[in-house]
């Protein structure tokens, strides 16, 4: 019964992640509609997209503590409702400033969904954790894929505001249903009964640890690539490569589909091939993502196979590292600090995600897409160094624990 239950829990965490990610990851498909309706340049588009990450970065550490204190179920329910209401709020005001504000509020709620789901997986899965985290993290690209297909369809008929409202209502419904169905494993109640002061001190210890710093440096560079690809791939293919809007939308959908496959693939590889090592695969992903962006920069008048091929490479690399991050960061914190540890890591990641799109958009406005993709490729390649450093530190930590 426990084996069956843990996979039900895994499915519920996937549903929550998908519902909250529908707009967060599908926003790239709405960008052309928002830019046209509000007459925005690339830099302002980047700021709007980045406001979601800014909200997450500002409050994710606190939400991680909330997960460890109140439990994952309460946080899943409250954040699902909050993110949905924020999107409905964004749909009610046809103003750029208010759009940025409500997307920031949405980001606050979105940032808490990963610590809650990550803690649930950590508690229910004692083995095959990389695979389980990969499955849960497929909710991000699955939600993005649904958003990529659904949101522009609604926007083309009724405008981007109705698309945001539809995404918000769907988020509320699915998150509420999943939270009501979720149950913690037997014996987990005491984990959530720690004093707030001790949770705060534990989070600070994790934030200062060399292992966590190295992991988050790598993931901060990878998330920069991921958010830029999701936000600007369609615009790049249309404006620089002169692809049609249908091909550009299809490429964005391929990114999300490939990311879903990649998160499962890399999670399984880390469990079965690398023996639980999450950082060696992450170093490989940095190299593949950098190569994919160089390929994208070289595209001019691409054929459909070329455009979809580069999208698949970017999805399998730049958008497929998340399960590895969630697994290693939760393992650093352990059952008692899983939410706090994920909150620390996500704060760094969302901070990078908030900076990357507007900086990339500003660079595009000044130098064009080709140079911007080359610069981002070089930056992502730097992630190999902290990935290998984290791998060495974590292996030494495990060896010391085994010797003790």
Ranges and model annotations:
Residues 276-325:
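C-terminal transmembrane helical hairpin of 12-TM major facilitator-type secondary transporters
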Residues 27-28, 211-264:
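Extracytoplasmic gate region of multi-pass secondary transporters
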Residues 1-3, 185-216:
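Juxtamembrane intracellular "pre-TM" segments in multi-pass secondary transporters
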Residues 69-80, 272-286:
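Cytoplasmic membrane-interface "Motif A"-like loop-to-helix N-cap segments
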Residues 135-184:
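Helix-loop-helix hairpin linking two adjacent transmembrane segments in secondary transporters
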